[in-house]
From Swiss-Prot:
This is GTPase Obg. Its EC number is 3.6.5.-. HAMAP family: GTPase_Obg. Pfam families: GTP1_OBG (PF01018), MMR_HSR1 (PF01926). Its cofactor is Mg(2+). GO terms for molecular function: ATP binding; GTP binding; GTPase activity; magnesium ion binding.
Amino acid sequence: MQFIDQANIILKAGKGGNGIVSFRREKFVPAGGPSGGNGGRGGSVILMADNNLQTLLDFKFKREIIAEDGCKGGPNKRSGASGQDTILKVPCGTEIRDIKTGIILGDLTKDKQSLTIAIGGRGGHGNAYYLSNQNRAPESFTEGKDGEIWEVQLELKLLAEVGIIGLPNAGKSTLISVVSSARPKIANYPFTTLIPNLGVVRKMDGNGCLFADIPGLISGAADGVGLGHDFLRHIQRTKILVHLIDAIAENPLHDFEIIEQELKKYGKGLLDKERIIVLNKMELVDDDYLQIITKKLEDLSKKKVLVISSSLKKGLSSLLSEVWKRI
């Protein structure tokens, strides 16, 4: 499935139905009073969160959503039928923003949570509405009101509790594949992962915790280099960041600093999040070098550094234990 996490769409509520002019005409009532009914309300456009959806792909080609118009009024003071509301299902974690003002209209984070965006137009009045002592046979009516039109941006931000971050080829996909049921594409070259991968990791008590493997960030990500903005937004909701560093990289310390700088530049509280620093691929370097680089990383980060091997499944219990302490 193609992963689409942003979409601009136009939402058009239905027009209210027109009122009508009608007079009661029956066999023994040749000159009855006004009986024109009111028009029905136009349908509204409602967004609803759905746990079964993972992407905004449905809106890639469907840019305009139009709700049903209300029906016109009828004789004998019958009101027209209201237009049917249009319910758009979106993934949990979808934020809705007004494109014109930039104002956030809502944030749908729970299954079945809904938000009415474009409200249907009110139905017009039929001539029965205008009956008065001064006017016993009104011929006035009003047309239905237009429905609201909104141009909005949908932005999906994943609801994972733990985000796994790091430069390309740090081993993020391998890690999530061995601690969860996720099965991302894995290969020994950068940028294998082009979309976030989600996996549920079970704790000792049986409860699940959602992990997200965020595609490799690079220098300049906070300024939009590569797909940086697209990926960084997905860690805004996480509680903990697992910063994975490749032990066989040319300069692991520099790699660490690149990601830290991108978090700082992007802002939005990313640098304030709990972070667990992890040195991966311990099996590919000798013990002396591993001790040296671990100590230097701890001095640089002012944090304890965990050492693991995702491929050999070493050190993972210590890593998960550290995660559970901080959730």
